[in-house]
Amino acid sequence: MLSCTTSTMPGMICKNSDLEFDLLKPCFYPEEDDIYFGGHNSTPPGEDIWKKFELLPTPRLSPDSALAEHSLEPVNWATEMLLPEADLWSNPGEEEVFGQGGLRGCTSNPIILQDCMWSGFSNPGKPESVVSEKLPGGYRSLAVGAGTLAPGAAAAASSAGHERSGTAGVGRGKAAWLTELSHLDLECVDPAVVFFPANKREPMPVPTIPTSTGSAISLGDHQGLSSSLEDFLSNSGSVEEGGEEIYVVMLEETQFSKTVSRLPTAAHQENAALSPGCAQSSELILKRYDLIQEQHNYAAPPLPYVDREDARPQKKPRSHTSLALKCVFRPKAPRLGSRNNSDWENIERRRNHNRMERQRRDIMRSSFLNLRDLVPELVHNEKAAKVVILKKATEYIHTLQADESKLLVERKKLYERQQQLLQKIKQYALC
């Protein structure tokens, strides 16, 4: 397996195949043959990945004028980065290195080349021991010393070692070693330069939040504002609640909105009336707003029942105006944007039917009440049912009809008697 450095960065490959393996030999460890098979002592990939990058100094970002002295064909690494992928792999010198024949000819005792990015060490001291074995004796102490530095410090020290030999924490021996190895890393490229398109990104614009005072709060300031607000809220618990102005502030990270609700107290109003000038200069007091949730204790004994007369609901007196209000009906205006006119007609028809039905019931009820008042037996019976009212009214009508027929017969008899008397009077007048 080819290493990640050789497979993704063709600019780091030397044109001389004899120096290729010697340059990259310290990056491979033969003891890692079983690392991809999940050994018991193996660690997950990526734990000590940065530890390996600390072992060797990072090469310079770009070659200088010394490239022409050591190479007959100067390589412009920026041009190679801009060339298509097919042109990069079409170099015959690179094909020999990436080919199987080139790898077999590098050494008589080939080892399994593994990816340094995804291999791991179970022992933290293993990388230093392997590098000390691979490098010459004069460079072992320098390599181990460089490996113990931080990633940022090691990269800075190695890049600055080509220009300044008096860097803090680096001796003369390290400067001499870097000078000797300068001809080997002329064609090497920093990994950050290889991933230039991925790292070169424009910063995203930070949204701003307009406030009432005219200032804007950015996204970066929002996090600091929330943290400082929490500290201020935790420290404001000891403030007296007598003459303060409570502000409830709610911050939502998704909407970046701030809602402030003002809850003035009676004491604050009194203080404002006494000293109006001090109220303007006083700072806003932010107080934590906690929701009080009361839960019923089922284990507690029940409270004694207290019968209060004032707690009983009073019955509303029945008014006669309610009947008149029910009769008055104001039809609602049709809604704008109705789906169909037929639906509105059906609704209007139902409303008219209901209105007429209510009117009919009210008229019938009033008729029964009037009929009850006409029947002598039901005049004082206000709770008489409709059936009783109809029955008594029918009987009363029959009696009235019988009395009427009797009166008619009597009237007829009286009329006949009247006629007889008139004839007698005429006879006495002629005599």
Swiss-Prot record:
Region named Leucine-zipper: 400-421
Any one GO biological process: apoptotic process
Location, primary (coarse class): nucleus
Compartmental location: Nucleus
MF-aspect GO terms: DNA binding; DNA-binding transcription factor activity; protein dimerization activity
GO CC terms in record: nucleus
Stored InterPro entries: bHLH_dom, HLH_DNA-bd_sf, Myc_transcription_factors, Tscrpt_reg_Myc, Tscrpt_reg_Myc_N
Start and end residues of each bHLH domain: 348-400
Superkingdom field: Eukaryota
Sites of Phosphotyrosine modification: Y36
Keywords assigned by UniProt, alphabetized: Apoptosis, DNA-binding, Nucleus, Phosphoprotein
Role summary: Has apoptosis-inducing activity.
Record note on quaternary structure: Efficient DNA binding requires dimerization with another bHLH protein.
Name the record gives this protein: Protein S-Myc
